[in-house]
């Protein structure tokens, strides 16, 4: 009997620079994504995503980073089935073509550099930033929001990489195949539903502590 990993285990994996698998609801996309922190967008991690994920490698990030880098929406009217919030695609100016695993890693890591400026990135490019909703998976149950929520909870920069996972036959992997992949490569595997539950518990606990520490004069 397979048991999903805990969110705590996922956070530890991300902090250690490892990739994890995150799956959404079977009534939504019913897909799994490989996810890693932007800090750990290494050549090895990007190459693994390209080789074994096979989907589009994107870079979910919070609103503040999108605004800092002046990344406008890819389109004015978003008609995507799940309203995935693509911005213009980018390459860092230090790259050549921008498409290699090495150079996509450079672009991702440069995005979270505290000194990053909009003019440091060419447009269009081969890295696809996605803007997460402000309230994360409570507002939208997508891999974009899950990525940013997980980075926040892990104490990492609010940006990561995600890549949809396809099977050998070109179809999207579903849960049974994702379980096999997680076992084969020893990857932590969690669900967005569990992430929502974890956030509810953490935020309710934080609120209870805050209320307990309030003096009568604060009420």
Curated annotation (Swiss-Prot):
Its EC number is: 4.1.99.12
Q: Does the keyword Nucleus apply?
A: no
SUPFAM superfamilies named among the record's database cross-references: YrdC/RibB
EC top class, as a word:
lyase
- UniProt keywords, alphabetically: Lyase, Magnesium, Manganese, Metal-binding, Riboflavin biosynthesis
| Annotated transmembrane regions | none
| Binding annotation for Mg(2+) 2 | 29, 143
Q: What family is it from?
A: Belongs to the DHBP synthase family.
Job of this protein: Catalyzes the conversion of D-ribulose 5-phosphate to formate and 3,4-dihydroxy-2-butanone 4-phosphate.
What is the protein's name according to its record?
3,4-dihydroxy-2-butanone 4-phosphate synthase
The protein's organism comes out as Methanocorpusculum labreanum (strain ATCC 43576 / DSM 4855 / Z)
